[in-house]
Regions:
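Intramembrane alpha-helical segments
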Residues: 90-163
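C-terminal transmembrane helix-loop-helix hairpin of multi-pass membrane proteins
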Residues: 179-234
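Short, Lys/Arg-rich, polar N-terminal cytosolic tail immediately upstream
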Residues: 1-26
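Multi-pass membrane catalytic core of lipid/isoprenoid biosynthesis enzymes
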Residues: 23-28, 32-42, 55-65, 71-118, ...
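Helix-coil boundary and interhelical linker segments in multi-pass alpha-helical membrane proteins
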Residues: 39-61, 103-121, 155-174, 226-234
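Long, highly hydrophobic alpha-helical transmembrane signal-anchor segments
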Residues: 23-50, 134-167
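C-terminal ends of transmembrane helices
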Residues: 70-85, 127-141, 186-194
């Protein structure tokens, strides 16, 4: 297997041209999926009866740091090294820690200042961040269902809780939206990843899976944008 096929550099959000290291860094950010994850936080906040926009923005930054940077850095240390060896294990650990510490600090501030219910949500998210990405407990939590729960359901709940310090029926319904859209994303992502790493760029299956992935990302971001525009402009 060639160097290109041994990493995820063939996947749809990674630039096809440019310096290889830059392309891998952009790939490591998983920026469409990181924005999708942050959009769940916005959706949760915008379901609240009254929206404090600075809390919503701060919680979105928490998830961009914790998931967009830290979780993906930990995942890159997997035995199969999905992004190759362009960063050492020590560099990935430093990147994960440097992003996780401020994320935890901001989250704890919001919990102590406004929403103590964020503490159990944050503990659950920290557990999944470590258990899923490092495949702890024999990989028991490295599954599509746990991914959907931690990556789709809980961010919506966190977004709502930071506004209200409560959980409601609408927030649970929003969480269900997060869960099922995240489940679709991860269910399409795994076979797509395998096809791309196997050099199946031109296969019809890979093309269809790519369309599903792009569609689900845009659908979640568009939902957040719709709710945000409604909150801002009525």
């Amino acid at each position: 297997m060639g160097e290109e096929e041994s990493t995820r550099i063939r996947e749809w959000w990674v630039p096809r041209r440019g310096p290889r290291t830059l392309r891998l860094l952009i790939g490591l950010s998983f920026y469409p999926y990181s924005l999708m994850n942050a959009s769940y936080v916005l959706i949760g906040s915008l379901l609240a009866p009254s929206v404090h926009f600075y809390r919503m923005a701060g919680m979105a930054v928490v998830y961009l740091l914790a998931v967009g940077v830290s979780a993906h850095s930990l995942d890159a240390m997997a035995p199969n090294r999905p992004w190759g060896e362009f960063l050492t294990r020590g560099q990935l650990e430093a990147l994960a820690l440097a992003s996780l510490v401020p994320a935890l600090a901001v989250g704890l501030f919001y919990a102590l200042a406004y929403a103590p219910l964020l503490i159990p949500v944050g503990i659950a998210e920290l557990f999944f961040l470590l258990a899923y990405n490092l495949e702890l407990f024999g990989g028991a939590f490295h599954s599509d269902l746990w991914f959907a729960a931690s990556w789709g359901f809980l961010p919506v709940i966190a977004g709502f809780v930071v506004q209200t310090d409560a959980v409601s029926i609408p927030s649970l319904a929003g969480g269900a939206f997060g869960f099922f859209t995240a489940f679709v994303e991860i269910s399409a992502s795994r076979p797509y990843k395998a096809l791309k790493r196997g050099g199946g760029d031109e296969s019809q299956v890979a093309s269809k899976l790519e369309s599903v992935l792009k569609g689900i990302v845009l659908a979640v971001i568009a939902t957040a944008a719709f709710l945000l525009s409604r909150a801002l402009f009525g």
